[in-house]
Amino acid sequence: MIESTPAPAAPKPDFSKSMFLLGNWTCSTKSSRRPAAFITTSTTTIDPTGYWMITKGVQHKTSWTRTDFKGVDMTTYDADARRWVDISTGDEGSYNLSTSPGWRGNSIVWTDAVISPQGNVMSTTPTTLTKMSDTKMSSHSTFKEHSGRMVTVDSACHKTG
């Protein structure tokens, strides 16, 4: 027998704990392998379907980069797997897939499931994003280079609109 009942729609994610992320942000990010912090500006919205939180960002040119670097992060909730999923793509073919069990207090921890093999990155540790207020947040992560050296990456972000 052929079924004619339409498949039910997946439940929309509950973005309530992440709504403070909507809007424009400026972040100063310091990597222990770079001489100075770099600046990223971004805008976060909810897509028209309500299933994705989308962040479009620009890492601005520095003395060690040739040009601005643009990227897109798309976050949703996988109700079947009971986890948040973040898919990132960027200039020069970069990509990343991270998952998280969700917010615990004022922090969310993202674990990389798949990373693009670029920039001498061999492995990563989870990234912790911490909400300081509705207009300030920070993040911390580390990664291992092929040489074995561990590199720390810390960001301080503030809302600009």
Predicted regions and their residues:
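Hydrophobic small-molecule pocket/channel-lining residues, especially in calycin-type beta-barrels
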Residues: 1-161
